[in-house]
Amino acid sequence: FSTIEQLIEIKTDLWKAIKSFSNKNSGKIEPTYIVNLGNSLKQQFRIAEAIECYDLVNKFNLDIPQSWINRSETLIMLNQVSNTFSIQMLEQIKRGYENVLLSKQVPPIWLDHYKEQIVFHKSKISEACRDAGIEPNPLDSEKTKDEYDKLSSYRKFCLENNLSLSEHGLYCQCMGSSRDNLTIPTAGGIVGDFVIPMEMVLNRLKSEFSFSRHLYFEYLTTEKDYELLHDSCFSELFNDELLGIDVEKLRTAFRLCFGILDKIGIAICELFDLYPPNGNVYFQSFWQLDRDNRRELFDSNKSPGLIALYSIATDLNEKKDGELSFLKQLRNDLEHEFVVVYKSESPSDIYDSYKFMDNIVFIKEDEFLEHLRRILQLLLHQ
């Protein structure tokens, strides 16, 4: 935590650069900016988001070897942080280095190093297969596709949108990522006193996240119940506001996400005895690293997870110039203001129904959906 603020500033500048480039170029993205953002997130142990950045760039099939190199390094980091691995993880690490060798942008002096990495991970794959009593399968990617095709539409949705509570699902869409099997890691199989209470916390977080995620899925995939809407007898005001159970699914899902964040903050305070002086825990602001000796207290725990969580909190904190602080503001508006979700380009208001109040917040449906997807992914990455 002694140097985290410098990394936060770099991350914030990269977010701004990506946004500025997109605004000036009709929504396009600059791949090298995305790779640099991924590298910054990797340094802050935001592994899932870093992999997402590299995957996005690699889909363009451009000659950007840094993306493949750092994706492989991030998978190695995932192995080290989670103390778990799979043959598929080793395969993808190796494949990343193989793609690097195809690049024309790699200095010749580095080629031997990447060749050594390929040989090393080939041997690890052979060793893992031998320990598991299986033969290496050159058709493994086809098997993965077959397994994916057999998944439910809901589970496919979770994997396609990076919303699966599975470490395996970060890099593979096989049957092994078909369940939300995230657990509290216990290095070396040693179960400490904290593990059972933290599993209880994780159960609560998974339950609320799963509910929020399913509300999002239902809104996108379930046909609107017009009979139920009719039975609600809403007054027709011709003001384009979306009403009824369907849109309330979005509102509820969004609010739930911030409740989950605050519960994560409480769990951190309980686990590491890090409650702020006033005892109030709001995820984006309870850290208060510059008060008393709290930075040293956080630093003494040597936890990559804490660094990742603090980094995410700064994204949501307006006082830290957080790129996603508008999400927290939207949550506050949903709780305390009249928020109108509308579908058209701009809401009409024939009868001037919105003039009664000055502080009505308007948000277009597709923007709200994108914000909900973003906060759900942010939760997953914790």
Model-derived features with residue positions:
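Flexible helix-coil transition and linker loops at the boundaries of alpha-helical arrays
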Residues: 3, 7, 11-30, 58-64, ...
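Single-residue signature of alpha-solenoid repeat helices
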Residues: 10, 50, 86-89, 93
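Acidic, Ser/Thr/Gly/Pro-rich intrinsically disordered interaction regions
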Residues: 78, 86-91, 98-207, 241-247, ...
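Short, hydrophobic, well-ordered secondary-structure elements
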Residues: 202-220, 239-272
